[in-house]
Amino acid sequence: MDDQNKNLILATALSFLVILVWFILFPPPEQTEAPATEIATTNGTAVQTPTAAATEGGAGEVPALDSAAPTQAEAPRVQIDTPRLKGSVSLLGGRIDELSLKDYRVSLDEDAEIVEMLTPAGSTSAYYALYGWAPGAGLNAADVPGPLTEWSLESGDTLSVGTPVTLSWSNGSGVTFRRTLAVDEDYMFTVTQSVENGSAAPIGAAPYGILARHGIGEDADLPGLKNFFILHEGVVAMNDGTLSEIDYKDVRKFDIDPNEGAQAEVFQNKSDGWIGFTDHYWMATLIPGSGTAFKSAAKYDARRKIYQAETVLPTMSVAPGESAEVTTRLFAGAKEWESIRAYQQDGVQKFLDSIDWGWFFFLTKPIFWLLHQINGLIGNMGWSIIGLTLIIKAIVFPLALKSYVSMAKMKELQPQMEALKEAAGDDRQKMQQGMMELYKKEKVNPAAGCLPILLQIPIFFSLYKVIFVTIELRQAPWFGPFRDLSMPDPTSIMNFFGWLPWAGPEAGSLTATILIGILPLLLGISMWLQQKLNPAPTDPTQAMIFAWMPWVFMFMLGSFASGLVVYWIANNTITFTQQYIIMRSHGYKPDVFGNIKSGFARRAKADKK
């Protein structure tokens, strides 16, 4: 067996096996968005609010707040209106519980609704941010604002960029609480909570923030989740530089924490951190001020099917006639790289790690950064992927050059190798020994041909991860029918790639996998042409593997994101060009058309037999 073909087949087979196992175990998930919120009365809408003692290891209280569900929709509201957000703040509890993202729609349809980020209690799968004060010395639960407190609008009208609003509430005992909300041009809210002690005695209270998310049904399901192996959905937290990721299913498995009175996992932060919930493209995060010690916790209320993320700051003591305030932040929006990076530069510790870069983060991060920079210049993600491929091929070219030169030398040595085989006869040991001596003498590495293929495996999976998790690829168009590079090729042989007046098969169906689109077809052709740089192997087994490999890959990758298939086509095309030029420059002229012709001739001859 030709050593070069043997190694090439082994490398190709390994790539095929890795992708096949991945495809079988973790098929591409259906690309679904969270449905529009339907208003419905939902039982069990209570959230667990901490007490000041909870910051010092004491037990928290779980007030009965079921009455909040039917009243939230009727409560007075303060509108939120920015270039990128719209929604409202409920004066019942001062909740930020209605928020939509103006720049994103649930689908590519022209009349598709914009994405809802937060929804009030009483809606399907409610999701909201709640702030308050846990009572300490001199106060009880009725003396501090909680989830059902009726706040008054003290100043401001509509919460917008540069126009904050202030809410106030007095407890009737001389203590006044205020909450000032501000929002920037993207997705960050600034929440300033203050307390003014007009009573005759000192008081203590601990400011807290809560993100609450209500599950549906017995399993506490959350609509719109992908539930896909390579994607983290659930709690994401940064604790003094250490990232923690806890899937929703694992949150439901928490042990009861006696200090919290609930299923919980608690983190003690010395100076920096944040905690929240992350989905495929969207995230809500509580961010205390940098340099502040605080406690954060992820909780699950099994009875009410509520997931919670909370931060509790140390108890603040306020003397009579004095006041105190604390400022924290809330991120609620899309996980855009530019926005997240800007917030990280503004002091949110390692905020870019909230994007799920995966196991190959050392590759996915630079690959996305490079793709993002190219897209900033070109303005089209499809052409940017091709540009990225060119740059990657240029980076690995020194290694590829050695491989292609070695392959060319192997072709030059073909007559000597055939002579060794004839001289050795059936003595395989003698033949192998002679081959090794020949390789050593001519300084040829017979395994060099597999290196370019093996290099593609980590790059392929890293780019797959980038295309799947980054919102910049969501609904990113290329040209013509390719309106979303994060989705499979929408074209099909069934309607001759859109030229015939009927619809193609439904995306993700078996029919769509069989009646492939134009991109998978080009992928198969590009792999087939790349094979034709060399004559077909004389060994029948090798020849059969080579013959089937391009078309198997074509159908396998047909259901992958079209952006990934574009990368593979570009990679094959560049590899073909590089290999052709290098092999010619070293004295071996690939006879592509001759190899194609001989392949058909050999097949016709086999059919006659």
From Swiss-Prot:
Recorded superkingdom: Bacteria
GO CC annotation: plasma membrane
Keywords for this protein: Cell inner membrane, Cell membrane, Chaperone, Membrane, Protein transport, Transmembrane, Transmembrane helix, Transport
Coiled-coil ranges (or none): none
Membrane topology: Multi-pass membrane protein
Main localisation: membrane
GO molecular function term, any single one: membrane insertase activity
Membrane spanning stretches: 8-28, 381-401, 451-471, 509-529, 545-565
InterPro entries per record: Membr_insert_YidC, Membr_insert_YidC_N, YidC/ALB3/OXA1/COX18, YidC/Oxa/ALB_C, YidC_ALB_C, YidC_periplasmic_sf
Any Pfam family: YidC_periplas
Any one GO BP annotation for this protein: protein insertion into membrane
Cellular compartments annotated: Cell inner membrane
PANTHER family per record: CYTOCHROME C OXIDASE ASSEMBLY PROTEIN COX18, MITOCHONDRIAL, OXA1
Database matches in HAMAP family: YidC_type1
Summary of subunit composition and partner proteins: Interacts with the Sec translocase complex via SecD. Specifically interacts with transmembrane segments of nascent integral membrane proteins during membrane integration.
Function: Required for the insertion and/or proper folding and/or complex formation of integral membrane proteins into the membrane. Involved in integration of membrane proteins that insert both dependently and independently of the Sec translocase complex, as well as at least some lipoproteins. Aids folding of multispanning membrane proteins.
Family label: Belongs to the OXA1/ALB3/YidC family. Type 1 subfamily.
Protein name (Swiss-Prot/TrEMBL): Membrane protein insertase YidC
Gene designation: yidC
